[in-house]
Structure formats: structure tokens, C-alpha cells
């Protein structure tokens, strides 16, 4: 199959994005991202050469991005890919010894195949004289996540879900807090709580709430619903988790054909945007890729949405045809319901491109127009595919090829590759260090750059002040109030607006959204509480991380890293390696500040980072300024500006 590529389109990508693609997504023989884009476009075209060409043109123009495994595991020619093109899996954990052992085996295989896993533990009986409860088993899962992964590309990741009514909910809530019995902790896992309508109604009414053993329904304890809710919010504010999964809302929106089969949603996935049924014989799959809303005006009148629905149906079929017997439940689920999850990124970039403030009715209007259009196009294509290829087996008579079509994943890596705002969330800063699987990169808001250029203020002094203010522009006297509103950062926004936008688009999204919330460190408890309550009241299916403003690392770094002078050497040195985006950004920062330095390539001199620094380090860059040891890139940023690098662990599997 012939697909014409244009290597000049590499110029549309930042250098660090190209480095990231080469390090994690391209095959060894692929010299350009365009070659990787061609490989994936052909692989997922279903043999349609015209579709393959369109897919290549879309992705090379940054209109969408393949999910990480869809790109990295796309086969070349008629061979098989390095792994499965599935981002994540959702598994049900039965309340039997056989089921628990089987879950462990399946989990290990799923991690090796490269997918993050959401495990649903609500039916495992509580602690008793004859049963240890779910926590010790979760401790073993915690160890598995360290051991099992797909090569260097995808680390094993796991999110455990438990009903709020489970008698072990308090211990489950605290299992990621590193105090207490280490044998009952799971520090490498994520946790999520299935929040029911009954519980929320008890919270509002100030009533007691029953904790029931899932084995027989026996009430083990009655507690204050409000106190439990307050504890949940407190732990979220402290650790960023647990995710909240509004399980009854999700089940109400399950397609009727699946309800008629007695299926139900028992939890979500690693990133809380996938809402599919699981059972003892069904492991749901996440088949993802995402549109770039920043370029909505360019692609809205094309067939891109329809083409991507068709492409994802092809990806799903490849998984069904090639999945090994070790993941037979996932294959069965994919075959029966054929769910896909077309997502989006770049929403905040789209607003800023048009000079629209996040906290505005105009933003709500754009939000509705965009997602109404995506939904209509996706539904039209699945109906076309049903005629062409047949309806999904669990939905005969539905007129659809796929039981689910849309899901908004976090898109951390995809957003970095396309230099756009991640997912449907606001930008964290207008100049910041963004941490992803490939490292940390300095990112500047290009729409702000355009405004600064028009005002004659696009200079080192302005950007240094923005970085010093942790990415904020509210201090800049030459910006008017409207411009300051457009470029508010995530933590400067009223978080109620994030919930409002999510609620406005939810009717057009059959699955869910990875909705992060951002609060300053000293946020009022009543404000944080109200935003969370509104998320349930307004019909969201869940909430992902709660991000709080981190303290400046400047002092912490000085405590962690001994800053000693090199003996008889007061040079500034950057020890680096080729194709290292961290190194390139470090040197850019030093040049920006007029700091002269020597660049030393460790590969050329045949030394390791540990050897040249005399420290137990194995990463680059390693930086000295005037003989003083600084450390890596993030340490450099803290040393130069006191700016806070972006905290928190992004979803490592569902970066659609």
C-alpha cells in the first residue's frame, strides 16, 4: 500500500516532541515521525488506501494523535506489532480463591502486553475469621506493578476500585498513605471509590450510612456519611486520590441492550474515563485515540471524526483477531460490545486561540458546539459501519457497530507531542515544566507569545517574571483584564467552571471524562467540598486527580542535593547525551540567562553520569554552575527561578 508522506511536516513538531516519538513510539528503522505515522495509518486503515492517506494527513498536520499503543504497536506490513494496540483494561475480581488467583495471572499478562488496568474489588468479602479481606491481595498487586511491564515503553499501572459501602473502605482509602502496617499498604497503586447515589443522599441529609459485607449483605457498621465524605475529600486534597467514580450515574447511561443482558459497570479504568461493564467472564478494553480541538476550525468540515471511528473499529478487530488466550476475557468483551473511545485534547488551546476566557458563556457555547458535532459524526459512522460490517453482537437491533464511541482520556503525552493543552483541562501554567514518561520540558504558551509580541513585551524579562510567578500573567501591567482572563492558569480558575464545562459536554460523551481539579494549597474546605458535590449533582460520571499547588522546590532541592564546588574547577558544565530533550531544554535555559557553559557528551567521552559527578545518579543532564553542583533539569529550574515543576503522576496508559 502506498501512502505519500511529507517529511517537511516534522517542522510542525517541537524538537522535544520528535525526540519523544523516536525514543518511545517509532521503530529503530524509522528516522522520522512521518514514517511512524505512515506505518500506523496503513496498519489501521483496514486495507483502504485512501483512508490510510487521509489518516496520515490528519496526524501529520496535528489534527489528531494515535493513542500511545496504537502508534507504538502498529504492525509493519502483514506482521504483528510489538504488543497490543489497547491502552487499558478493566477487570472484575470475583469473591473466590480461584478468582483472586486468576485475576493475578490475568493482571500480569495485561501489564506485559502494555495496558494499564482498573480492578474492581467491591464484591470481595470483608475481613473475617476465615477471610483476610481485599487489602492483603491488593498488597500483592502492588508488588506486581513493579515487576511486570511492556519493555521500556509502558510501565505496569493499576487502579483499584471499591464501593463506598464496603466495610473495608476506610483502610482502602488510607492504603496509599505510607504510615501503619507496611504489609497492608499499596503505595504503587492508585485507588478509586465508587460513590453511590444512596451515599450522596445520606451526605446531604446528614444521615448514617451502612457498610455491608458484599458476601451476604450483612451490615457490619453504620457510620456518619458526612464524616466519611469529609475524610475522602481530605485524603484527596492531601494525596490527589482516590478518584471518585459516580457509579450509579454511569450505570444509568449504560446502553439499554447491555442492561437487558444483566450487565453493569463495576468501576472504571486507570484514568477514570472508561465506563464499560465487567464480570467474571468480561474484561473490558480501552481502544483509544484523540482529536486535537486546537485545530477544530481546520478539520470540522472534513470526514476526520468518521474516519477515526472507522479506524478504531479496525484497531479493535486487530485485537480480537490477535489477542492471545491469556486475555480471553478481554477478547470476548471486545468482540461482544465493540466499544471504542474517541477522545479530545487542546480544548483550552482552542479557547485561547480565539481569545475566549475559560470562565465565560462563550466558552460554554464553543464547548457545546464542538462536542455536539463530534457526537453526531461518530454516531453517523457507527450506524454506517453497522450496515457495512454488522451490529455489535450484544446490540442486535441497535443499528450500531459499537456500543460506545467517545471517552476523554488525559492525553498527557499526546498533548506534549502536539504542543497543545492536555485533554479537556485548563493549562497549568503559561510557562512551565511538563513531566511525562519521556522527561520534563519547558513549554511556553504560543498564543500568549503572540499577544506579548503585539505589545512589544515578548522578551526575556517578561518570561522570567512569568516563570517566577509559576506561569501566571496576572502581575503583568501591560495586559488588560480581558487578556488576563484568557490566560488564567488552572489554579487561578474557579473550579466550578471545570465542572460546568464537563457537565455541559457529558450528554455528548457516551463514556466519561478524565476530569482533574486544581486547588491552591490554602483553599477553603467549603469551596473544595462544594465543587465535589456539584460534580455529582450536575451528572459527571467521575473525578480524576485533585491537584494542589506545590511548594516551591528551591529550598527542597538544596536539602536533597549537596551543592559542592568542583575541586579547582569553577566552570559551568552540562553533561548530556544525544537526543536528550531534558539536556536541550537545560542548555536553552542557560543560554536565555546568558550563562556561559561547556557541553560535555557522556557518550563521546565514554563516561557515565555517576562517574563524572561522583554521585549515585544515572540520568542526564547533570549540571554544574560555576563549579556548584545543581543536579538535573528540574533542579536547574528551581535553582534559577524557584519555579515549581508540574507535580503529580499522569495516567501512564490512557494517553489517547
Language-model features: where?
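Extended catalytic cores of very large enzyme megasubunits
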Residues: 1-563
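Structural micro-motif
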Residues: 145, 541, 614-624, 633-634
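Local sequence-structure signature of Cys/Sec-based thiol-disulfide redox active-site neighborhoods
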Residues: 240, 565-598
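Short loop/turn microsegments at loop-to-beta-strand junctions
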Residues: 402-404, 570, 618-620
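A short glycine-rich beta-strand->turn/loop micro-motif centered on a GG-aromatic cluster
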Residues: 545-547, 573, 597-605
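Thioredoxin-like thiol-disulfide oxidoreductase module
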Residues: 600-618
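Non-catalytic, surface beta->alpha helical segment in thiol-disulfide oxidoreductase systems
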Residues: 625-647
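Short acidic, low-complexity intrinsically disordered linear motifs used
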Residues: 645-656
Amino acid at each position: 500500500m502506498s501512502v505519500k508522506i511529507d517529511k517537511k511536516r516534522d517542522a510542525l513538531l517541537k524538537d522535544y516532541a520528535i525526540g519523544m516519538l523516536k525514543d518511545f513510539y517509532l521503530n529503530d528503522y524509522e528516522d522520522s515521525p512521518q514514517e511512524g505515522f505512515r506505518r500506523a495509518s496503513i496498519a489501521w486503515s483496514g486495507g483502504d488506501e485512501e483512508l490510510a492517506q487521509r489518516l496520515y494527513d490528519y496526524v501529520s498536520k496535528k489534527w489528531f494523535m494515535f493513542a500511545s499503543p496504537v502508534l507504538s504497536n502498529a504492525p509493519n506490513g502483514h506482521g504483528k506489532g510489538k504488543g497490543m494496540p489497547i491502552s487499558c483494561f478493566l477487570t472484575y475480581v470475583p469473591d473466590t480463591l480461584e478468582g483472586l488467583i486468576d485475576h493475578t495471572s490475568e493482571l500480569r499478562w495485561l501489564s506485559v502486553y502494555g495496558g494499564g488496568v482498573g480492578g474492581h474489588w467491591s464484591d470481595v468479602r470483608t475481613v473475617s475469621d476465615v477471610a483476610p479481606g481485599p487489602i492483603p491481595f491488593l498488597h500483592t498487586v502492588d508488588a506486581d506493578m513493579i515487576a511486570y511491564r511492556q519493555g521500556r515503553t509502558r510501565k505496569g499501572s493499576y487502579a483499584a476500585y471499591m464501593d463506598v459501602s464496603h466495610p473495608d473502605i476506610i483502610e482502602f482509602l488510607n492504603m496509599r498513605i505510607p504510615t501503619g502496617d507496611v504489609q497492608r499498604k499499596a503505595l504503587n497503586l492508585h485507588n478509586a471509590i465508587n460513590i453511590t447515589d444512596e451515599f450522596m443522599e445520606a451526605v446531604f441529609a446528614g444521615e448514617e450510612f451502612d457498610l455491608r459485607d458484599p458476601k451476604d449483605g450483612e451490615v457490619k457498621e453504620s457510620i456518619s456519611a458526612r464524616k466519611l465524605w469529609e475524610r475522602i475529600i481530605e485524603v484527596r486534597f492531601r494525596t490527589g486520590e482516590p478518584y471518585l467514580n459516580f457509579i450509579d450515574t454511569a450505570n444509568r447511561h449504560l446502553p439499554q441492550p447491555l442492561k437487558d443482558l444483566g450487565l453493569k459497570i463495576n468501576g472504571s479504568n486507570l484514568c477514570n474515563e472508561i465506563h464499560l461493564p465487567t464480570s467474571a467472564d468480561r474484561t473490558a478494553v480501552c481502544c483509544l485515540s484523540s482529536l486535537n480541538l486546537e485545530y477544530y476550525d481546520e478539520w470540522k468540515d472534513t470526514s476526520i471524526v468518521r474516519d477515526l471511528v472507522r479506524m478504531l473499529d479496525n484497531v479493535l478487530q486487530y485485537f480480537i483477531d490477535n489477542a492471545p488466550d491469556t486475555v480471553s476475557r478481554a477478547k470476548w468483551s471486545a468482540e461482544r460490545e465493540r466499544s471504542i473511545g474517541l477522545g479530545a485534547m487542546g480544548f483550552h488551546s482552542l479557547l485561547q486561540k480565539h481569545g475566549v476566557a475559560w470562565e465565560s458563556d462563550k466558552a460554554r457555547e464553543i464547548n457545546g458546539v464542538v462536542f455536539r458535532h463530534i457526537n453526531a459524526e461518530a454516531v453517523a459512522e457507527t450506524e454506517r459501519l453497522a450496515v457495512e460490517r454488522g451490529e455489535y453482537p450484544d446490540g442486535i437491533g441497535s443499528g450500531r457497530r459499537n456500543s460506545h464511541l467517545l471517552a476523554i482520556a488525559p492525553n498527557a503525552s499526546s498533548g506534549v507531542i502536539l504542543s497543545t493543552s492536555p485533554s479537556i483541562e485548563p493549562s497549568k501554567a503559561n510557562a512551565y515544566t511538563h513531566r511525562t514518561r519521556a522527561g520534563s520540558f519547558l513549554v511556553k504558551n504560543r498564543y500568549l507569545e503572540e499577544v506579548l509580541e503585539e505589545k512589544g513585551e515578548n522578551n526575556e524579562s517578561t518570561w522570567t517574571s512569568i516563570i517566577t510567578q509559576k506561569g501566571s500573567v496576572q502581575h503583568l501591567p501591560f495586559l488588560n483584564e480581558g487578556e488576563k482572563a484568557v490566560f488564567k492558569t488552572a489554579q487561578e480558575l474557579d473550579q466550578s467552571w471545570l465542572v460546568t464545562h464537563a457537565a455541559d459536554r457529558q450528554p455528548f460523551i457516551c463514556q466519561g471524562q478524565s476530569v482533574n481539579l486544581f486547588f491552591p494549597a490554602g483553599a477553603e474546605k467549603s469551596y473544595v467540598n462544594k465543587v465535589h458535590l456539584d460534580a455529582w449533582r450536575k451528572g459527571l460520571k467521575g473525578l480524576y486527580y485533585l491537584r494542589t499547588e506545590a511548594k516551591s522546590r528551591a529550598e527542597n532541592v538544596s536539602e536533597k542535593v549537596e551543592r559542592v564546588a568542583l575541586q579547582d574547577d569553577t566552570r559551568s558544565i552540562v553533561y548530556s547525551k544525544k537526543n536528550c530533550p531534558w539536556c536541550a531544554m537545560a542548555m536553552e535555559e542557560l543560554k536565555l540567562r546568558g550563562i556561559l557553559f561547556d557541553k560535555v557528551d557522556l557518550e563521546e567521552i565514554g563516561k557515565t553520569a555517576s562517574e563524572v559527578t561522583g554521585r549515585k545518579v544515572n540520568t542526564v543532564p547533570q549540571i554544574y554552575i560555576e563549579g556548584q553542583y545543581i543536579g538535573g533539569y528540574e533542579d536547574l529550574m528551581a535553582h534559577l527561578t524557584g519555579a515549581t515543576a508540574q507535580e503529580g503522576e499522569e495516567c501512564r496508559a490512557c494517553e489517547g
